Amino acid sequence: MAFTAQQQLRAAELRQLLNRAAHAYYVLDAPEFEDAVYDRLYRELLDLEQQHPDLLSADSPTQRVGGPPAEGFSSVEHRIGMLSLDNAFNAEELQAWDARLGRQLEDNPERQREYVCELKIDGNALALSYADGVLVRAATRGDGSRGEEITANVRTIQAVPLRLQLKQPPAWVEVRGEAFIPDDTFEAINAERQQRGEALFANPRNACAGTLRQLDPKAVAARRLDFFAYTVHLPADEMGPKSQWDALQWLETAGFRVNPHRERTSGADGVVAFYDRWEEQRHQLPYATDGVVVKLDALERQQLAGFTQKAPRWAIALKYAAEEAPSRLLRLVAQVGRTGVVTPVAEFEAVPLAGTSVSRATLHNADRLEELDLHSGDTIVVRKAGEIIPEVLRVLPELRPEGAEQLELPSHCPECGSLLVRESGEAATRCVNSSCPAILRGALRHWVSRQAMDVDGLGGKLIEQLVDRGLVRSIADLYRLDAALLASLERMGEQSASNLIEALAASRQRPWHRLLYALGIHHIGSVNAKTLAAAFPSWEALQSASEEALNELYGIGPEISQSMQQWCSTEANQSLMAELAALELPLASDDSSAESAGAIGALTGQTLVLTGTLPNLSRLEAQALIEAAGGKVTGSVSKKTNYVVAGSEAGSKLQKAEKLGVAVIDEAELKALLS
């Protein structure tokens, strides 16, 4: 049945009224309507939508209650990477970061940098995408590059606006923030679970993460999650905030709940004063916090400071002091990693810390083990560094039992029996047997991981079976497995085996840069692997690359280039690459692949250097555009450089370009080249 114009107008009016009322209640804490009035208006809209389904819209408050259960979550790529933050754990580390940032910005030593301090909410990061003001996608952080699409679940969070409260919303905008569960809600959830005989959540963060991954949005709605927004990303051509402080005000204007406990301050001392105040008062808040997030205020200076591979240089998390607890040491275990490093791990009687039960902690290396002077049966003090990673802080020797033996790392590998080696000047003790089962298991786990070759269905337990039974002795052996053999293994059947064979076959189509990362070469992360693959589009090209050529690449220094050359020159690694080539794995870039690290385009064969701050593009965005057009971005200017792209406050690279006669262009000229 068609709806009338009057019904259409009434539905729009009801949506506007109800969304405004929800914002006033959940965000401003200033209710506009009595509950009975809200319920009557809500019922009227619901009846209209049920009678005329075509009136239903994505921003309707009736969509918050959740639709039918989902079959699963799809993986989505973040338009802008969701990086993590570096941490500081005391005032000295914060001051060192502030000084380092000043040097990177080439500030006068006396200059006090302007910072915005915000409470670090202990929840789960979300990215919310709005098209023409309407929420169209919500995703988890995931690995920073890709997350899970959980839009239906996030629509149930009342503090998340389904439509932005802006008269002229941008065509696209992404808002980031933290979903969390308030303390009283968390206690109520656990009380209900206890009554039903279900396992209790360890802490609100875990409860929030588990809730967001519920397949039934109605179950999510029942948990009453909350949300604070803290970042906005607008298109480059959109006039937006010029500072983090203004960005927070923009978010409030757009209808988001922003944490009120924030402060703009000058210098590290102001940051420390804010931190000290909230470390003392944090338990008075109705939700969990685990520190203070500090951001350089001016967005232009943020761009100038730039990013490392994992985190922005212009922001840091100053974490609260960790909780401590005494425990009794039970045993020392030597754990062998995928690179052969043997790590001492302390196992002790379980103690509650920061909302979870802790019974193991890494001791990192033999030096730390010797420094602690651990003996069997010792009483130790355990804490969680950053309230995440358990560590043994100290030993209480006065409580040591009589006759206790000093604990040391074994002289031989606990996995293969080979003599362990510790090179002069190195902290790490290693097993150097390339056939060690522990090294192989670690290498296989890394190879099949999502950011690497992404082989679905090949988990840790199955890898253990394959290695322990001698069915897989190298990465290459994975591609020699057959379905009949796999089906005979524990917890495997014909269908699971068939699915795994298909997943392995699909992994042969991964681009060259993914394979390069999957090899697990020391210092070669996913970002460096892309850089290397773009510059050297095949194994042969990379193998023959000189150290000088490697060092010219943006983000590649001597440590990385030496590690790469050492790996390439090792006979066992050369044999592995020959096997992978014979098995038709991607040892070269495929320009037809959407994920190809390189591309043929307007800048193919051209070398560019970026310097200064561009008016619209961040350095990472500019680099991505250049590489997508087939160009190469390096970190230094030479006679081989084709263009230097200069923004405001360009430094010595601009001077060197002028001296060498290298063409200097601005952002507009770069875009013209790209087109």
From Swiss-Prot:
One example GO MF annotation? metal ion binding
Q: What is this protein called?
A: DNA ligase
Q: Which InterPro entries match?
A: BRCT_dom, BRCT_dom_sf, DisA/LigA_HHH, DNA_ligase, DNAligase_adenylation, DNAligase_N, Hlx-hairpin-Hlx_DNA-bd_motif, NA-bd_OB-fold
User: Can you quote a single GO CC term?
Assistant: cytosol
Q: Where does Zn(2+) bind?
A: C413, C416, C431, C436
Alphabetical UniProt keywords? DNA damage, DNA repair, DNA replication, Ligase, Magnesium, Manganese, Metal-binding, NAD, Zinc
Q: Which NCBIfam families match?
A: dnlj, PRK07956.1
Q: What class of enzyme is it?
A: ligase
At which positions is NAD(+) bound?
Answer: D35, A36, V37, Y38, D39, S84, L85, E118, R141, E178, K295, K319
Question: Which residues does the UniProt record annotate as the domain BRCT?
Answer: 598-675
